[in-house]
Curated annotation (Swiss-Prot):
A zinc finger (AN1-type) spans 171-217. It holds the Pfam family zf-AN1. Induction: By cold, dehydration and salt stress. This is Zinc finger AN1 domain-containing stress-associated protein 14. Zn(2+) 1 binds at C177, C180, C198, H201. It comes from the Eukaryota. The gene is SAP14. PANTHER family: AN1-TYPE ZINC FINGER PROTEIN, ZINC FINGER A20 AND AN1 DOMAIN-CONTAINING STRESS-ASSOCIATED PROTEIN 3. It comes from Oryza sativa subsp. japonica (Rice).
Length: 237
Protein backbone atom coordinates (compact mmCIF):
# COMPACT_ATOMS: atom_id res chain seq x y z
CA UNK A 1 0.00 0.00 0.00
CA UNK A 2 1.42 3.37 -1.02
CA UNK A 3 2.05 5.99 1.67
CA UNK A 4 1.56 9.73 1.33
CA UNK A 5 4.36 12.24 2.03
CA UNK A 6 5.41 15.72 0.95
CA UNK A 7 7.80 15.80 -2.01
CA UNK A 8 9.22 19.28 -2.79
CA UNK A 9 11.31 17.80 -5.62
CA UNK A 10 8.22 17.27 -7.72
CA UNK A 11 7.57 21.01 -7.95
CA UNK A 12 4.66 20.86 -5.58
CA UNK A 13 5.85 21.83 -2.14
CA UNK A 14 2.44 21.63 -0.65
CA UNK A 15 1.35 18.45 -2.31
CA UNK A 16 1.99 14.89 -1.44
CA UNK A 17 3.44 12.15 -3.67
CA UNK A 18 2.74 8.51 -3.85
CA UNK A 19 5.60 6.33 -2.72
CA UNK A 20 5.97 3.13 -4.78
CA UNK A 21 7.62 0.23 -2.97
CA UNK A 22 10.88 -0.85 -4.69
CA UNK A 23 13.20 -3.68 -3.70
CA UNK A 24 15.93 -2.22 -1.54
CA UNK A 25 14.31 1.26 -1.19
CA UNK A 26 11.52 3.55 -2.29
CA UNK A 27 11.27 6.72 -4.36
CA UNK A 28 8.54 9.07 -5.35
CA UNK A 29 7.11 8.66 -8.85
CA UNK A 30 7.53 11.82 -10.99
CA UNK A 31 4.71 13.50 -12.88
CA UNK A 32 3.68 12.04 -16.29
CA UNK A 33 5.45 14.72 -18.36
CA UNK A 34 8.67 14.25 -16.41
CA UNK A 35 8.31 10.48 -16.78
CA UNK A 36 8.32 10.84 -20.56
CA UNK A 37 11.41 13.09 -20.49
CA UNK A 38 13.23 10.70 -18.21
CA UNK A 39 12.30 7.73 -20.42
CA UNK A 40 13.66 9.46 -23.52
CA UNK A 41 16.86 10.48 -21.70
CA UNK A 42 17.36 6.99 -20.34
CA UNK A 43 16.79 5.47 -23.80
CA UNK A 44 19.29 7.89 -25.37
CA UNK A 45 21.83 7.14 -22.65
CA UNK A 46 21.28 3.39 -22.82
CA UNK A 47 21.64 3.17 -26.63
CA UNK A 48 25.31 4.27 -26.81
CA UNK A 49 26.14 2.41 -23.68
CA UNK A 50 24.63 -0.77 -25.12
CA UNK A 51 26.55 -0.37 -28.41
CA UNK A 52 29.78 0.36 -26.56
CA UNK A 53 29.21 -2.58 -24.26
CA UNK A 54 28.55 -4.83 -27.27
CA UNK A 55 31.75 -3.60 -28.92
CA UNK A 56 33.67 -4.12 -25.69
CA UNK A 57 32.22 -7.60 -25.31
CA UNK A 58 33.15 -8.51 -28.91
CA UNK A 59 36.70 -7.19 -28.40
CA UNK A 60 37.00 -9.14 -25.17
CA UNK A 61 35.77 -12.31 -26.86
CA UNK A 62 38.29 -11.89 -29.70
CA UNK A 63 41.07 -11.30 -27.17
CA UNK A 64 40.01 -14.38 -25.25
CA UNK A 65 40.01 -16.43 -28.45
CA UNK A 66 43.49 -15.22 -29.35
CA UNK A 67 44.77 -15.97 -25.88
CA UNK A 68 43.03 -19.37 -25.95
CA UNK A 69 44.58 -20.21 -29.31
CA UNK A 70 47.97 -18.97 -28.22
CA UNK A 71 47.82 -21.06 -25.07
CA UNK A 72 46.97 -24.23 -26.96
CA UNK A 73 49.52 -23.41 -29.64
CA UNK A 74 52.13 -23.09 -26.88
CA UNK A 75 50.94 -26.20 -25.05
CA UNK A 76 50.59 -28.43 -28.17
CA UNK A 77 52.65 -27.49 -31.25
CA UNK A 78 50.94 -27.76 -34.61
CA UNK A 79 51.41 -31.11 -36.31
CA UNK A 80 52.12 -30.64 -40.01
CA UNK A 81 52.72 -34.33 -40.75
CA UNK A 82 49.17 -35.09 -41.78
CA UNK A 83 49.00 -31.86 -43.74
CA UNK A 84 52.23 -32.67 -45.59
CA UNK A 85 51.04 -36.22 -46.33
CA UNK A 86 47.76 -34.89 -47.67
CA UNK A 87 49.58 -32.32 -49.81
CA UNK A 88 51.98 -34.98 -51.13
CA UNK A 89 49.13 -37.36 -51.99
CA UNK A 90 47.22 -34.59 -53.72
CA UNK A 91 50.32 -33.56 -55.69
CA UNK A 92 51.03 -37.17 -56.73
CA UNK A 93 47.43 -37.67 -57.82
CA UNK A 94 47.59 -34.40 -59.75
CA UNK A 95 50.81 -35.46 -61.51
CA UNK A 96 49.30 -38.84 -62.39
CA UNK A 97 46.22 -37.11 -63.80
CA UNK A 98 48.45 -34.78 -65.83
CA UNK A 99 50.38 -37.73 -67.27
CA UNK A 100 47.16 -39.49 -68.25
CA UNK A 101 45.86 -36.34 -69.90
CA UNK A 102 49.11 -35.89 -71.83
CA UNK A 103 48.98 -39.52 -72.99
CA UNK A 104 45.42 -39.03 -74.20
CA UNK A 105 46.41 -35.88 -76.07
CA UNK A 106 49.32 -37.68 -77.70
CA UNK A 107 47.09 -40.56 -78.81
CA UNK A 108 44.52 -38.11 -80.15
CA UNK A 109 47.22 -36.32 -82.17
CA UNK A 110 47.28 -33.11 -80.15
CA UNK A 111 50.73 -31.76 -79.29
CA UNK A 112 51.18 -31.37 -75.49
CA UNK A 113 52.40 -28.18 -73.89
CA UNK A 114 56.07 -27.30 -73.62
CA UNK A 115 56.25 -27.89 -69.85
CA UNK A 116 54.55 -31.26 -70.14
CA UNK A 117 56.81 -32.28 -73.03
CA UNK A 118 59.90 -31.17 -71.08
CA UNK A 119 58.79 -33.21 -68.07
CA UNK A 120 58.15 -36.24 -70.27
CA UNK A 121 61.58 -35.84 -71.90
CA UNK A 122 63.24 -35.65 -68.48
CA UNK A 123 61.47 -38.81 -67.35
CA UNK A 124 62.46 -40.61 -70.54
CA UNK A 125 66.11 -39.59 -70.05
CA UNK A 126 66.05 -40.81 -66.46
CA UNK A 127 64.54 -44.12 -67.56
CA UNK A 128 67.19 -44.55 -70.26
CA UNK A 129 70.00 -43.80 -67.79
CA UNK A 130 68.51 -46.16 -65.21
CA UNK A 131 68.07 -48.86 -67.83
CA UNK A 132 71.66 -48.41 -69.00
CA UNK A 133 72.94 -48.71 -65.44
CA UNK A 134 70.90 -51.87 -64.86
CA UNK A 135 72.10 -53.33 -68.15
CA UNK A 136 75.70 -52.61 -67.14
CA UNK A 137 75.21 -54.06 -63.66
CA UNK A 138 73.25 -57.17 -64.73
CA UNK A 139 73.04 -58.47 -68.32
CA UNK A 140 69.56 -58.74 -69.71
CA UNK A 141 68.09 -62.21 -70.18
CA UNK A 142 66.82 -61.19 -73.61
CA UNK A 143 70.40 -60.65 -74.79
CA UNK A 144 71.43 -64.17 -73.83
CA UNK A 145 68.26 -65.54 -75.40
CA UNK A 146 69.01 -63.69 -78.65
CA UNK A 147 72.60 -65.00 -78.66
CA UNK A 148 71.37 -68.56 -78.12
CA UNK A 149 68.80 -68.24 -80.91
CA UNK A 150 71.42 -66.81 -83.28
CA UNK A 151 73.87 -69.63 -82.52
CA UNK A 152 71.19 -72.30 -82.99
CA UNK A 153 70.13 -70.70 -86.28
CA UNK A 154 73.74 -70.68 -87.49
CA UNK A 155 74.15 -74.35 -86.55
CA UNK A 156 70.93 -75.26 -88.36
CA UNK A 157 72.10 -73.37 -91.46
CA UNK A 158 75.44 -75.23 -91.43
CA UNK A 159 73.67 -78.56 -91.07
CA UNK A 160 71.29 -77.83 -93.95
CA UNK A 161 74.19 -76.73 -96.15
CA UNK A 162 76.18 -79.87 -95.40
CA UNK A 163 73.15 -82.10 -96.08
CA UNK A 164 72.32 -80.32 -99.35
CA UNK A 165 75.88 -80.70 -100.72
CA UNK A 166 77.06 -84.32 -100.27
CA UNK A 167 80.62 -85.45 -100.95
CA UNK A 168 81.78 -86.73 -104.34
CA UNK A 169 82.13 -90.32 -103.12
CA UNK A 170 78.53 -90.70 -101.91
CA UNK A 171 78.25 -93.35 -99.23
CA UNK A 172 75.13 -95.43 -98.58
CA UNK A 173 72.92 -94.56 -95.68
CA UNK A 174 74.26 -95.59 -92.31
CA UNK A 175 71.13 -97.44 -91.25
CA UNK A 176 71.15 -99.82 -94.24
CA UNK A 177 73.51 -102.56 -95.32
CA UNK A 178 75.69 -101.61 -98.27
CA UNK A 179 75.15 -105.04 -99.89
CA UNK A 180 71.55 -106.11 -99.26
CA UNK A 181 70.12 -102.68 -98.36
CA UNK A 182 68.48 -104.08 -95.28
CA UNK A 183 67.84 -101.75 -92.39
CA UNK A 184 70.34 -102.36 -89.66
CA UNK A 185 69.79 -99.35 -87.37
CA UNK A 186 72.23 -99.31 -84.49
CA UNK A 187 73.24 -102.96 -84.94
CA UNK A 188 75.14 -102.34 -88.17
CA UNK A 189 78.82 -103.19 -88.52
CA UNK A 190 81.31 -100.62 -89.75
CA UNK A 191 84.01 -102.01 -92.02
CA UNK A 192 87.47 -100.52 -92.61
CA UNK A 193 86.52 -99.92 -96.21
CA UNK A 194 84.01 -97.34 -94.94
CA UNK A 195 80.73 -99.22 -95.47
CA UNK A 196 78.08 -100.37 -93.02
CA UNK A 197 76.91 -103.97 -93.26
CA UNK A 198 74.49 -106.32 -91.60
CA UNK A 199 75.48 -109.39 -89.64
CA UNK A 200 75.54 -111.61 -92.76
CA UNK A 201 77.77 -109.29 -94.80
CA UNK A 202 80.05 -107.95 -92.14
CA UNK A 203 83.04 -110.06 -93.13
CA UNK A 204 85.43 -108.99 -95.88
CA UNK A 205 84.89 -112.07 -98.08
CA UNK A 206 81.08 -111.62 -97.86
CA UNK A 207 80.87 -108.11 -99.21
CA UNK A 208 84.02 -108.09 -101.35
CA UNK A 209 86.00 -105.69 -99.16
CA UNK A 210 88.76 -103.88 -101.02
CA UNK A 211 90.78 -103.04 -97.94
CA UNK A 212 94.33 -104.45 -97.99
CA UNK A 213 94.70 -106.02 -94.59
CA UNK A 214 98.19 -107.40 -95.34
CA UNK A 215 99.66 -104.01 -96.19
CA UNK A 216 98.06 -102.39 -93.17
CA UNK A 217 99.35 -105.22 -91.00
CA UNK A 218 102.89 -104.75 -92.25
CA UNK A 219 102.73 -101.00 -91.65
CA UNK A 220 101.43 -101.56 -88.17
CA UNK A 221 104.21 -104.03 -87.38
CA UNK A 222 106.82 -101.63 -88.76
CA UNK A 223 105.51 -98.83 -86.58
CA UNK A 224 105.46 -100.95 -83.47
CA UNK A 225 108.97 -102.40 -84.14
CA UNK A 226 111.26 -99.67 -85.40
CA UNK A 227 114.68 -100.70 -86.75
CA UNK A 228 117.49 -99.53 -84.50
CA UNK A 229 120.79 -98.95 -86.31
CA UNK A 230 123.84 -98.70 -84.08
CA UNK A 231 126.59 -96.33 -85.05
CA UNK A 232 130.04 -97.83 -85.32
CA UNK A 233 132.47 -96.42 -82.86
CA UNK A 234 136.06 -96.06 -83.91
CA UNK A 235 138.51 -96.55 -81.11
CA UNK A 236 141.95 -95.12 -81.39
CA UNK A 237 144.83 -96.79 -79.64
Amino acid sequence: MATKRKCPANGDDGGVADLEPVAGGSFASPPPEKKAKLTVAVAVAVAPSSSSSATTAAAGEATAKREHGGFFAFARPENNTRLSVAVASSSSSASAAAEKAMAKLTVAGVAPSSSASAAAAGKATAKREYGGFCAFARPDDKTRWRVAVASSAAAAADASYSSSSPATGEQPEANRCATCRRKVGLTGFKCRCGGTFCGGHRYADEHGCGFDYKSSGRELIAKQNPVVVADKLAFRI
